[in-house]
Amino acid sequence: MRYQTVFWILLIALCTVNPAKIQDVASYGGTVRLTDSGRAKCSRKTWPCETSEDCCDKNCSDTFWTCQLGYGCSRVCV
């Protein structure tokens, strides 16, 4: 029973999203602009991502949405 309670608390915490961040993403259009260095190679990025340039590009395991929702670009690019 205790594990079930912990599971539901974690699920609710993961589903809670800052509405302001969603609005920022919606107004931005959800596209990612790559810098010249981003096109050449993908480097390790860390949370928090402030702008689209801080977020990993399409060749990385973390996505723009992951960054904008506050979960961070912490994985090594693939």
Swiss-Prot record:
Coiled coil: none annotated. It comes from the Eukaryota. It is found in: Secreted. Residues 1-19 form the signal peptide. Pfam families: Toxin_21 (PF08091). The keyword Signal applies. Disulfide bonds join C42-C56, C49-C60, C55-C77, C67-C73. InterPro entries: Spider_insecticidal_peptide (IPR012626). One of its GO terms (cellular component) is extracellular region. Keywords: Disulfide bond, Ion channel impairing toxin, Knottin, Secreted, Signal, Toxin. Expressed by the venom gland. GO terms for molecular function: ion channel regulator activity; toxin activity. Its main location: secreted. The presence of a 'disulfide through disulfide knot' structurally defines this protein as a knottin. Probable ion channel inhibitor. Belongs to the neurotoxin 13 (insecticidal toxin ABC) family. 03 (JZTX-59) subfamily. This is U29-theraphotoxin-Cg1a. It comes from Chilobrachys guangxiensis.
